[in-house]
Amino acid sequence: MRWWRRFDAKEVARDFTRVRGTGADIVRFFLLWEDFQPEPFTVSDEALSHLRTVADVASRSQLQVIPTLFTGHMSGANFIPEWALGGTRERARFRVIAGERVVDRGIRNWYADEDIARAQVTLARECARALAGHPALWGWDLGNENSNCCVPATRDEGLRWLDRVADAIRSVDGGCHLTIGIHLEDLEEDRRIGPAEAGRVSDVLSMHGYPIYASWSAGPMDEAFVAFLAAITRWLGGKDVLFTELGAPTQDGDPDAERQSGAMLLGEDDARSYLSAAMRGLQQTGATGALTWCFADYASTIWNEPPLDQAPHERHFGLWRADGSPKPGAAALAESSAKTRVEPEPVPWSEELRDHFYDSPKTTLVRMYRERRGLKGAKPPQRLARPLL
């Protein structure tokens, strides 16, 4: 979470060796926004140097990388530079963290605020310049679940932002891939920057999904859930899908997590079973690949810090434990890495339905899922409790 400030290339090499040992070939990581851009038009030379080092280590480890810009949203909180904040918050769902402390300020909407958008263009261009042509670079992720920070007022506003950031990257590196991390709530609600808008600049679409966060899933081990989201995303956006976040938090004797989030936590063997089945479903539905969230559990020394203090289940999503030992889920990653992609099958949904999907997105989404699973007349699944983040 704060690795850029406490950067250790040897730790990166150790962790990449573990990842590569499963057969995985790509790693996605976050560029904590305030670490890379301490002032609106100042990009940290030290952070860019660390970024190049990470790419070099990845290349030696035979891994490719997807750096994620403007992070932004992570583990149930929004990490935002002080200069990108303004005013007071209006009943915001997620806490805002700036300078390692929770602040009671709102986020300036970068889709509408020209100064923030220009600063983001600067960051995107300079980061892309730093890795232009690097053999380890797969491409750039234009944000992690950006709609958890702010949303455009109109589709055109969102499209203008996407075009500007994409153009900034491609002005210095025309050969890299682009994507942007959208998530379940971008399907459940019309946030005006969903799959169709993302598809305008993305080489492949990215989707994130967890059955624990959907009241309409069949439960925390609903292995069909992520494959359905991938199919919906491809249908709405018209491009192939790389599923860049799936996973499950596991039981670890953490009393806070058990008390606040017990219904979300799986035993480690159950988590492996879920991951194996979910990744198999993604492969069978034609996804270009799948990335798990996340590499390792958070060390207990930072459990009392935001956001982990109020979202204890976020401490335990790792495929490796905090001490570096692998959970059974790491074996699921190894099994899936050996599989080859299949071509997506045609979906049964009409163009007319697609054109009107966002008239009533959540109702439509739930109905489509229940029909896909043959649950049209079945009793709705019991709602899972979700902790306040």
Predicted regions and their residues:
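Active-site mouth of glycoside hydrolases
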Residues: M1-S202, A299-I302
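Long, C-terminal catalytic modules of enzymes
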Residues: A278, T285-T288, F295
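Active-site clefts of carbohydrate-active enzymes
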Residues: F30, N144-R155, V204-A218, L229-L275, ...
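Generic structural signal for well-ordered alpha-helical scaffold segments
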Residues: R125-R129, L229-A230, M279
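A short acidic, glycine-rich active-site loop
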Residues: W4-R6, D104-I116, G262-S273, F317-A322
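Glycoside hydrolase catalytic-domain groove-lining segments
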Residues: D156-D167, S171-E258, Q283, T288
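Aromatic-rich peripheral "rim/lid" segments of glycoside hydrolase catalytic domains that contact
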Residues: R89-V103, L282, W293-L389
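Amphipathic alpha-helical segments in well-structured domains
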Residues: L48-L51, G158-L162, F225-V226, A271-L275, ...
